[in-house]
A protein has these predicted regions:
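Transmembrane helix-loop-helix hairpins at membrane boundaries of multipass inner-membrane proteins
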Residues: 1-2, 16-119, 206, 210-211
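Structural signature of hydrophobic alpha-helical transmembrane segments
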Residues: 1-9, 84-95, 138-150, 222-233, ...
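Central hydrophobic cores of alpha-helical transmembrane segments in multi-pass inner-membrane proteins
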Residues: 4-19, 34-46, 92-107, 124-125, ...
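Alpha-helical transmembrane segments of multipass membrane proteins
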Residues: 14-19, 44, 103-104, 126-130, ...
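Alpha-helical multi-pass transmembrane bundles of energy-transducing inner-membrane proteins
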Residues: 23-25, 119, 123, 127-217, ...
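Alpha-helical transmembrane segments and their helix-start/interface "positive-inside/aromatic belt" motifs
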Residues: 25-37, 171-183, 384-386, 461-469
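Juxtamembrane/interfacial segments at transmembrane-helix boundaries in multi-pass membrane proteins
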Residues: 50-79, 164-178, 184-243, 273, ...
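Predominantly late transmembrane helices and immediately cytosolic-facing juxtamembrane segments
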Residues: 240, 354-357, 423-457
Length: 510
């Protein structure tokens, strides 16, 4: 019964924030902080008290660590079916942690309509948890689309205009909404197609994951349906050429919105590929793998090259996310358990390091009132601790050994090499560009001649706790990743079996 509460807690907390605004602006902040802390605590409790050797695998009914099922619309085979395994648990703990951080980082930034702001923030996170738990495909689609509306309000009502003043927050919010909504509708068509194919085969209408895994279909049908899912996830991940909404949404969103976008919303797409696209359509995925890995490779370089050219610090971090997600895409489609484990580690580590960079850029904006790096410079000696933390997270972002990002990238490259040596070699050279744009960002913002003589105040306790806490966690994951690898091992083994079997069949057919 604990699984529905993981989803309900953020929704109830959001309503309480909205209603609590009449008692002052501070109450909604505390309600939101307690709500997210409770979600994180429940995630940690589940981690401590679960056996994560249970996970779905081919050839048998999926087994789960925890499961909740309640018939909802019997006529169409729709049920409230939630289930937890190692992969979804890691993602829920990441959601809880970044939820706490997004409340903390907006503590002073948001002054207008504080209650409604936190309602939207909590409902985004509730929708994300729903995506990570839902197994019924109708429920999954419901939560997938539900996240978009509060995110739209978050960017449109509390966002900033771009540093050159040309692009407004409404433009960014609308672009985000249209891209993700349109891709979601393509996925809805694919879900309905899959349900109808299964109905023609069995005579039963069902949206249940376990039943749809057994659907028999021709390779052409499988390929078309797989593309429907892939496009929806590719837009959210984002994969080049579906990425153009991301820099605008990041640059114009408030800090909390950027933290949630980079840290959690992009990860729902990678989760969707691992949970739905590969297991439901293994043969089509195996055939599509070279194309997907090539798209990942293009993303690594394209994101890095565009990051070079940015003057807006938040747009630079946004393009670095495009580059990092390219590695995740390569890892997912490699068919190797090492690389799949690496993709999960990269999702966790990139969620933390990108969130940290956005939090620090928000703190920088509060002090300098600009996001344009040409107007910064010479700040290293002016703000205590903030430049040093920025340097650490920039180094983590480029994959410094000893941080979680290194573990993820190393495992992806190590696991992919036997299957696709050329892609691995080219992707490895992409790491060099990662170091260049990370160091360019630090150099432009903190070194060089000072642009103003204004006295800037140092970091307060709240800001220090966020920065140092995230740094400590990234180092912990980098030095001792085993607990996280053990948690996701069974799930990734199942995904690898689906894809590995399909690769073997494909090779023998050729």
């Amino acid at each position: 019964m604990i699984l529905p509460w993981l989803i309900l807690i953020p929704f109830i907390g959001g309503l309480l924030c909205w209603m609590g605004e009449r008692f002052g602006a501070t109450l909604p902040r505390w309600i939101a902080l307690i709500t997210m802390s409770l979600l994180l605590a429940l995630g940690l409790w589940l981690w401590a008290n679960g056996d994560y050797s249970f996970a779905p695998a081919p050839g048998a009914d999926p087994t789960w660590v925890r499961e909740f099922k309640h018939i909802w619309i019997e006529r169409f085979g729709i049920s409230v079916h939630l289930a937890l395994d190692g992969l979804s648990l890691l993602m829920i703990m990441l959601t809880g942690l970044l939820g706490v951080l997004s409340v903390l980082c907006s503590w002073k930034e948001i002054q207008r309509h504080v209650g409604f702001f936190h309602l939207n923030l909590m409902w985004i996170l509730g929708g994300v948890v729903g995506v990570f738990l839902a197994l019924d495909l109708f429920m999954f689609f419901f939560f997938w689309e539900m996240m978009l509306v509060p995110m739209y309000f978050l960017i449109a009502l509390w966002g900033h205009s771009s540093s050159d003043g040309k692009k407004t927050r409404i433009y960014a919010a609308t672009k985000f909404f249209i891209f993700t909504q349109a891709s979601g509708l393509i996925m809805l068509v694919a879900i309905l197609g899959l349900v109808l194919v299964n109905f023609n085969d069995t005579g039963v209408i069902t949206f249940n994951y376990a039943d749809l895994l057994k659907t028999k279909m021709s390779l052409t049908t499988e390929y078309i349906l797989m593309l429907g899912f892939f496009i929806a996830f590719a837009v959210k991940l984002p994969v080049v050429p579906f990425h153009s909404w991301l820099p605008d949404a990041h640059a114009q969103a408030p800090t909390a919105g950027s933290v949630d976008l980079a840290g959690i919303l992009l990860k729902t797409a990678a989760y969707g590929l691992l949970r739905f696209a590969l297991p439901l359509f293994p043969n089509a995925s195996a055939e599509f793998a070279p194309i997907a890995m090539t798209l990942g490779l293009i993303g690594i370089f394209y994101g890095a090259f565009l990051a070079f050219a940015q003057t807006d610090i938040k747009r630079l971090i946004a393009f670095s996310s495009v580059s990092h997600m390219g590695f995740v895409l390569i890892g997912i489609y490699s068919g190797s358990q090492l690389a799949l484990q690496g993709a999960v580690m990269q999702m966790l580590a990139d969620g933390l390091s990108a969130a940290a960079l956005f939090i620090l850029s928000g703190q920088l904006y509060e002090r300098t009132h600009t996001r344009d790096m040409r107007e910064m410079g010479g700040l290293w000696s002016k703000i205590a601790y903030l430049p040093a933390l920025s340097l650490f997270f920039a180094a983590a972002s480029l994959g410094l050994p000893g941080t979680g990002n290194f573990v993820g990238e190393f495992l992806i490259l190590l696991g992919t090499f036997p299957a696709a040596p050329w892609i691995t070699i080219i992707a490895t050279s992409g790491l060099v560009f990662g170091s260049v744009y990370s160091l360019i960002m630090i150099h432009r913002a903190y070194f060089g001649p000072a642009k103003s003589d204004a006295v800037l105040h140092g970091m307060d306790g709240r800001e220090m706790i966020m920065g140092v806490g995230l740094a400590a966690l990234l180092i912990y994951i980098g030095v001792y990743p085993q607990p996280f690898l053990d948690t996701s091992a069974a799930t990734m083994h199942g995904v690898q079996q689906w894809l590995g079997t399909a690769f073997t069949q494909l090779a023998s057919a050729r």
